[in-house]
Amino acid sequence: AASYDAAIDAFNNAGSYKDASDKVIECTYKKAEALITAKKYDDAISILSTIEEYSDSQTLLAKCYYNKASELLDSGKYDDAYDMYMKSEFDDYKNKASECTYKKAEQYYKNKDYENAIKSYDNKDYKDCVAEKDKCYQALGAQAYKNKEYKKSVDYYEKVVKTDVSKKIANGKLAFANANKNAANETTMTYLGE
């Protein structure tokens, strides 16, 4: 990159000499290519942004965003990776952006942050998001049941789509009825659908 800097300076100092300004842009482009080869994507992005109209700079810029996003994804920076993929609009960027969201959801699930996992799994077109979301609802349902929040438990179980949880719903309703048998019968019966 240093040799390109020297060439750029030399052409800049050439003033209006024949093709000097074109050579500055060409050297700048070559410097960006060298930075990409060295995987210095931030520097390459910065340079390519100044010469977007030259040759295939826009395509190269998109590749830089994409490659930078891949690095961010690999390092677990899912939000930043998602943004960078979307900025790239390159190759399979939408699928890769969905992967970022999915991996973030997996992380939430692993940390038992089921509510945020559900929000992240909301992309129904990627992998097995619906099934993963179901696991979150089941975990929340079990948690609520354990805490004797039976109505809440049933509400979570009723959101499960792909798995038969009818027994868990019935158990939750029964537990709710037993817990509220001394409460106003009308409220309990209305909830139970009777």
Predicted regions and their residues:
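Residues that mark the junctions of alpha-helical repeat units in TPR/alpha-solenoid scaffolds
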Residues: 24, 61, 97, 133, ...
